């Protein structure tokens, strides 16, 4: 754990994540936890789903790891209709649920949180001044407030990311394109695969994943090279592709349900969901190498230092997924978030959902946030929370406090 204390100190002092850690210390201090089932910790849940009781467990190293790295996670599950904040709370992980309609793509950083659903984009901003006012006092260090909504129509929003100009790019799966938004239109198509003959709401290739490089869209994944309605379903087990956006060229074929391409540490990473694996891509040879195989359908990933935080889903629809390699390898799949060391492929720890959540879509690390809050649209705190420009604050006069201590 000393390596992680150094990492936290380094991040605090320099703002950068160190690329070196003591691999021996890391695996030695955490690996034993994975082998002893009696040492799993039940997670603490708040605002849990009402229809099905939530139960989850985690390896007992994760709360300490989250605290030392000063991170939390935001996770989306469209199946349960929830966005989950995963936070260290003493010796346990707290999974804090908020309700949305089929939330999928997430674009998040220290100042903003943007969530995509089937037909809606929800915009949130972090307002740190609100955090101390949330009970229990002194516990929260960030608070995301809802700011606005954009209605896209049913475009089956998948992954999203902001570019260098703070423009949001969206994987529009139903129309098989990358799009952006403006105030006048449902969406603005910006790019589509060259093998598609038309812009049509037929989910022709199941475009799903987006990797940004240098702050611009660079790589996308799709489940097929097909130009017919839902044509990708005919060869879903190994018809997946990776494309270069700039060149509009297919770089890889033969992938098994690829998702979540990411450019990290000068490498292109990809989740081959049908294999339940994490892989790296060699663009020169147009090949890929498996780094880790995991006990579930891999989808949703983010990185921090030498760690990958990977979403796993159970995939229960055997009629749809019956020919996947993952199902041949495992009779039962797992849902949760797995933490993998990207240099060794070893599992460092995990959060496993045992009821209530069966599918994960997006996983993002919230760096520098230990215990964030996400206010729902009907929260009464929104009525008395005002975010003003700095130049306007000097002219604000607050009313006197009442006898009870509240503002009049």
Functional labels for PLM-detected ranges:
Residues 75-78, 114-119, 162, 168-175, ...:
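Conserved beta-strand positions in repeat-built beta-propeller and related beta-rich domains
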Residues 236-246, 326-343:
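Beta-propeller blade signature
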Residues 92-159:
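Blade-loop segments of beta-propeller domains
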Residues 134-208:
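Asp-box/WD-like beta-propeller blade repeats and closely related beta-sheet repeat scaffolds
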Residues 58-70, 122-134, 220-237, 311-332:
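Short, conserved, GDST-rich strand-edge loop motifs in beta-rich repeat architectures
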Residues 257-283, 287-339:
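Loop/turn-rich, solvent-exposed surfaces of beta-rich toroidal or solenoidal domains
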Residues 56-68, 99-111, 150-167, 196-218, ...:
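Beta-rich, blade/repeat-based domains predominating
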Residues 345-403:
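Blade-level signature of beta-propeller repeat domains, shared across WD40, Kelch, NHL, RCC1
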